[in-house]
Amino acid sequence: MLKNVEIYSKSNCLYCDKAKNYFSQNNIEYVLHDAEIPEVFDALMIRNPYARTMPQIFIDDELIGGYTDLEDWLQTKQD
């Protein structure tokens, strides 16, 4: 089971919604960070200065990346 999931998200973001839906449908709790708040965005830039897209997903403080990165990461965990 996945623990310590964090999602940096913005409104009107299809892939952000997909990530949140994945975790919700699989009963995985996550902390949602609103990247439209300047202080939250600044914190994201400290954690991942190369972030250019949303969402940005962290699991156990490990940067997973965006939604397609999450799909790839989950696939490697199933193999």
Q: What feature does the model see in each segment?
A:
Residues 17, 42, 72:
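Alpha-helical elements of the RecA-like P-loop NTPase motor core of helicases
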Residues 34-50:
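Thioredoxin-like thiol-disulfide oxidoreductase module
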Residues 48-57, 67-68:
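Structural micro-motif
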Residues 59-79:
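Non-catalytic, surface beta->alpha helical segment in thiol-disulfide oxidoreductase systems
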